[in-house]
């Protein structure tokens, strides 16, 4: 990504402790440590058993072992293919998740996150029903978090690295560009292995769910100017 988010500068941040966000990050890291320590063959087998294999979900292939077939829609959200994949996903969740948790409350945020992830998994299966390799990662759920952030904090400044320079950019640029790139690149899964349809499905779910689940005091598309931060600003 050309714009690498570092942190957000939110005037409403810090109202509640984001226990669920921290818990989700901790679970993903613990699972990552556990599976990355496995022998390579065992790790590969595990991904095929509890990762999301569309051909298994569509009944083209038999399920492997006793793992419930449709549970992979959920379990795939907590698996990653390496440390870079894990750390980058958790970094985005750490930046954007606390704001959505603060807006929705702890329990509703947990439900929101899981529903975004399940939708992302389902959309990916529909987009590639014959695929025989596993899809794993939290990015579909996190795409939903980012879409919700765009809708309730569109003008919040995000400190990003634009190539090598720190710049404060409005959230609608950072997240808007990221979402647009998912649509631009949606046909390139075979080339880069990135599940763009999962991201799109998660983002659409997040946009719809934040409308349905937000408390009455949480406004949509409301711009509030945060305190000035270092670096240049793009509005």
Describe the residue ranges of each PLM region.
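A detector for small-residue-rich transmembrane helices and their helix-helix packing motifs
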Residues: 1-235
């Amino acid at each position: 990504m050309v714009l690498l988010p570092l942190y957000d500068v939110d005037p409403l941040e810090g109202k509640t402790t984001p226990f669920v966000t921290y818990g989700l990050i901790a679970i993903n890291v613990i699972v990552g440590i556990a599976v990355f320590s496995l022998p390579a063959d065992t790790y590969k087998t595990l991904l095929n058993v509890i990762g999301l294999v569309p051909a298994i979900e569509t009944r083209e292939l038999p399920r492997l072992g006793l793992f419930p077939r449709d549970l992979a829609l959920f379990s795939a959200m907590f698996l990653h293919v390496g440390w870079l994949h894990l750390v980058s996903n958790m970094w985005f969740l750490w930046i954007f998740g606390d704001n959505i948790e603060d807006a929705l409350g702890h329990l509703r945020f947990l439900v929101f996150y899981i529903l975004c992830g399940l939708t992302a998994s389902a959309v990916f299966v529909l987009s590639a029903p014959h695929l025989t390799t596993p899809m794993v990662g939290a990015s579909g759920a996190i795409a939903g978090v980012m879409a919700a952030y765009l809708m309730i904090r569109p003008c919040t400044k995000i400190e990003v690295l634009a190539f090598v320079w720190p710049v404060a950019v409005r959230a609608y640029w950072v997240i808007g560009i990221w979402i647009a790139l998912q649509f631009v690149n949606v046909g390139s899964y075979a080339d880069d292995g990135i599940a763009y349809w999962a991201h799109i499905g998660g983002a659409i779910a997040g946009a719809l769910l934040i409308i349905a689940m937000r408390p009455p005091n949480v406004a949509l598309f409301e711009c509030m100017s945060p305190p000035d931060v270092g670096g240049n600003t793009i509005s």
